Amino acid sequence: TDIIIMREGLSLVRDELVRVLDALAGFSDKYKALPTLGFTHFQAAQLVTVGKRATLWMNELLLDLEEVEHRIAALKLLGCKGTTGTQASFLELFEGDHEKCKELDRRIAREMGFKGTVPVSGQTYSRKVDAAVLSTLSGIAQSACKFATDVRLLCHLTEVEEPFETKQ
């Protein structure tokens, strides 16, 4: 079930990334001609547009989206490997027929919406899968941190300002 939960979670993350990218695309298009000062290592450089700046954030998130989609596609179900990964109980049920065990794995994977199962395992899937998913999520966090830091620095320079309401 962990792999199924990971796939569902990554799918939710993917959908949110698409929504953020869509919002940034609208923002970028709206401000594509609005000039602003560009920076290199937070030192004034040359004019860019606000829209161009937003496309830099979008590019990072697009790379993250590609990684999330790759990670979802690469997930493989554990299948029916048994308590030690040998499929011993299934081999007994299928009277030693390894092909029937493989077919059972294929059917389970297909039924659960996966392209395949891991070829070899112990009782559980490899924790390398957890590390790969964590790395993917870390990449999104890095992009969000860059985006947020840029906005914060631009607020300091009053390039970007928070709106204030009359009753605030």
Regions found by a protein language model. Give the residues of each.
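Internal glycine-rich alpha/beta core junctions
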Residues: 15, 46-168
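Long, non-coiled-coil amphipathic alpha-helical linker/lever segments
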Residues: 1-46, 113-129
